[in-house]
Amino acid sequence: MNSNGHEEEKKLGNGVVGILAETVNKWERRTPLTPSHCARLLHGGKDRTGISRIVVQPSAKRIHHDALYEDVGCEISDDLSDCGLILGIKQPELEMILPERAYAFFSHTHKAQKENMPLLDKILSERVTLCDYELIVGDHGKRLLAFGKYAGRAGLVDFLHGLGQRKLILGYSTPFLSLGASYMYSSLAAAKAAVISVGEEIASQGLPLGICPLVFVFTGTGNVSLGAQEIFKLLPHTFVEPSKLPELFVKDKGISQNGISTKRVYQVYGCIITSQDMVEHKDPSKSFDKADYYAHPEHYNPVFHEKISPYTSVLVNCMYWEKRFPCLLSTKQLQDLTKKGLPLVGICDITCDIGGSIEFVNRATLIDSPFFRFNPSNNSYYDDMDGDGVLCMAVDILPTEFAKEASQHFGDILSGFVGSLASMTEISDLPAHLKRACISYRGELTSLYEYIPRMRKSNPEEAQDNIIANGVSSQRTFNILVSLSGHLFDKFLINEALDMIEAAGGSFHLAKCELGQSADAESYSELEVGADDKRVLDQIIDSLTRLANPNEDYISPHREANKISLKIGKVQQENEIKEKPEMTKKSGVLILGAGRVCRPAADFLASVRTISSQQWYKTYFGADSEEKTDVHVIVASLYLKDAKETVEGISDVEAVRLDVSDSESLLKYVSQVDVVLSLLPASCHAVVAKTCIELKKHLVTASYVDDETSMLHEKAKSAGITILGEMGLDPGIDHMMAMKMINDAHIKKGKVKSFTSYCGGLPSPAAANNPLAYKFSWNPAGAIRAGQNPAKYKSNGDIIHVDGKNLYDSAARFRVPNLPAFALECFPNRDSLVYGEHYGIESEATTIFRGTLRYEGFSMIMATLSKLGFFDSEANQVLSTGKRITFGALLSNILNKDADNESEPLAGEEEISKRIIKLGHSKETAAKAAKTIVFLGFNEEREVPSLCKSVFDATCYLMEEKLAYSGNEQDMVLLHHEVEVEFLESKRIEKHTATLLEFGDIKNGQTTTAMAKTVGIPAAIGALLLIEDKIKTRGVLRPLEAEVYLPALDILQAYGIKLMEKAE
């Protein structure tokens, strides 16, 4: 070891403690030690506390600000290099791990969780000692450091907050409406006081009879449930036994003769249920037995939906659950109950067990948007509270809402033994409960956790081709399937089981592993165990049976802590008929950019393995091959958080941070894949293309092929790669539809006389609810500037030039023949003549026109606003003075330039309209422009933001604010081609049309815009065609070749993006 290594090694046990700034989650405000804990540790002296210094990384969001730590003697610094022990709450970023240090945090690695193995690898490679809070267990067998009660407390407060809003939408005003979310209160005491106030109002004013009885059902009896019940008990309440629930619904409903409720209810009801209330034995002669249920859940039927759910208003889910147990409430059960008019209002899933015991809770929610609505009638998810369905909450970081109290509780316990960790130089120095919590020591796994590599190596997902040296059990003469359930990992029973197998001379292979997701949850594993001698296999079974059923002959060191359940099954033998092994071709795609377009592209590529077995896929890519294509997708973004959010819920997609200006990082990731799909701004494509040429990787973009990229054609060709550009919607699908129509005409010996194309990204009719009938899905500046570009096209042989300032005035009414309900207009889109060259029709077509679509009336209003000066991008004198003015004052400045009194206020539509008329516009035009100006808020007496230096800036600011899509609104894409074909021999003229109409959709709570789909999916199809080697042309190309556009259009249709074609 070099001298620097010796210096690093000396840090361990030096008594200097570091506290990390939490960076993984924006809401994480907890801290392992509060200033008061630090004060006691520092002022107690190193001889007594084991701590000489505490260095705190600065954090503006931590619940206790830096100055409070500094006041008690802590040092504030980003540099923790002097620290031998570093504390956090959640896992730190990998680059924050310093070598030869001790770390303590919740690592979530001891069950070999796949997603956290890179963290463990980093820990081991940096020779770090890791103590996991989750594994610090007291003599009673329970965790010492946990936040369960705080999750329960915050969870129920948050749900009551949402319950008030939901009831109001359903037509009932309740005291819950005044309650805020947990994080809105300065302390737990303040939140409790607010709940008490709600309770007092219920006790004195009552609740509407129409929502009563209001029954809260709590699952489980652990700390989470106790915390939630603690909040519930602040309300006037009565607890009811599960068997008594039906009685609440048969009492006098208090309905008068005219059918109106005449009574109020002055309390709420609670019911605590455990597993015995959720299931019953399949054998009617047998009663519920908890031990039997945990060992053999298959012997029991679920009954919660029959006995409890019909009487539940709010289900507060606090219990652990495993996949081998029946669902508490399935989607089908909820749908059946809904038809019967059940009273279920909402699910408060504090466990945040996604797709777990409550099947339809399909995603975690955020503290600042904690709710979603599931409508079982149409199996749809919504982000609002309006409409039918069940309100669901599943926040996974609830304790941080009471960060002050949670941190105090945590630090009270941690400060009792942090000194031992800070002064530890040898693991043997630690007390037993801390020693058992150390997953690694100086970069080596401790003996209790040596099973982790074994689990990783035998996990088919992680190492399908790298089974451990013992060999797969199916290679042995005698084989069995052993099912183990219990606290296999946190109680280290898995070590004993694997040791027994190996000690007897057997082998094992992990066939299945389902990890318990909480301290109380059990884990479940299936091991294929093999031996070449039947007696050896019998010995293994006997040993495992004794481990599962300890007695005087065999006492497990952990017998008191837990038992495991054991089942023996059959493994397919060598002489049995086996299915032909599936052959898979592995490919990789790197997607650069994590914007809206990325998700549908990533989703398509990640689903290739599934769709490659479908008939249409075999048709396009070859039915003879037995191989399935499996595409591993890497999504790279400058901000890792964006990439992670974009790919959430898509399997086999990896999110990474990548700055394309960092050539080393770009080379690293491009080298790992077969195709790069760049969804970055066009200005970034050249640098990406050069890297692809260097590494001989194909590239796909959805952007126009610019001059810089075109110049790379020969280099790309020499490298044997394809750079496929313009593979989106416009450009993209428009090219492909056009080339198919034109090529079909030429094959039939026809001559294209006229080619016209119209395309627009629009709000759906329901979302076109403003004077412009238009909305922006991103900053409107680009769209407005596009409306000022000059245009050129050919009409009946004449070349028509349109100046940018007259573009909106040139708009003409337009109707799609097959879609007459859409009242549209179009204006020319830049230079249409270049498309005559691209499509090979420049000499034969007398009309070549490409237009942009908008709803009718848009252009007249935009032209008027432009003439009035609302799009003036030069610095405005009033805005540049530094004096803050209101939008109303700015409006007066714009419209009163030529008036005698420039400061004349313009309050309403009528006054604004009159002023516009005075400026030379017609009455109709003025009225519509005035309506738009008022809608945008230009007449409001609020200050113009200081960042607005021009009227154009102010207009864009208001348009972005007022013309944005709300959560449930759909956008729409409409693309329409018309081609007139003349057949010289027959002297007939045919008109061919092709139309694409696509709407955005909401699926599993995720909104995907039509624009994102129609740009992202074609780009992904381009990548797939290159992966499957269906594009043979090399160099820079557009989708103008039949080898691209024919399969691409067919795949688009097979994937659900429909094209309507017609000939007359």
Curated annotation (Swiss-Prot):
Activity regulation remarks: The LKR activity is stimulated by NaCl.
InterPro entries (UniProt xref): AASS (IPR051168), AlaDH/PNT_N (IPR007886), AlaDH/PNT_NAD(H)-bd (IPR007698), LOR/SDH_bifunc_enz_cons_dom (IPR007545), LOR/SDH_bifunc_enz_cons_dom_sf (IPR043009), NAD(P)-bd_dom_sf (IPR036291), Sacchrp_dh-like_C (IPR032095), Sacchrp_dh_NADP-bd (IPR005097)
Location(s) in or outside the cell: Cytoplasm
Highest taxon above the source species: Eukaryota
Variation of activity with pH: Optimum pH is 7.5 for LKR activity of isoform Long, and 9 for SDH activity of both isoforms Long and Short.
Species per Swiss-Prot/TrEMBL record: Arabidopsis thaliana
Stated name of the protein: Alpha-aminoadipic semialdehyde synthase
Gene name per UniProt: LKR/SDH
Pfam families: AlaDh_PNT_N, Saccharop_dh_N, Sacchrp_dh_C, Sacchrp_dh_NADP
GO biological process, one term: L-lysine catabolic process to acetyl-CoA via saccharopine
Assembly and oligomerization: Homodimer.
Phosphoserine sites (modified residues): 458
Lineage of the species this protein comes from: Eukaryota, Viridiplantae, Streptophyta, Embryophyta, Tracheophyta
Tissue: Ubiquitous, with higher levels in flowers. Isoform Long is mostly present in young leaves, cotyledons, root tips and mature root parts. Whereas isoform Short is mostly expressed in cotyledons and at low levels in all root parts.
Catalysed reactions, as listed in the record: L-saccharopine + NADP(+) + H2O = L-lysine + 2-oxoglutarate + NADPH + H(+); L-saccharopine + NAD(+) + H2O = (S)-2-amino-6-oxohexanoate + L-glutamate + NADH + H(+)
UniProt-annotated stretches for the region Lysine-ketoglutarate reductase: 24-445
Record EC number: 1.5.1.8, 1.5.1.9
Entry similarity comment: In the N-terminal section; belongs to the AlaDH/PNT family. In the C-terminal section; belongs to the saccharopine dehydrogenase family.
Chain intervals for the UniProt region annotation (Saccharopine dehydrogenase): 583-1064
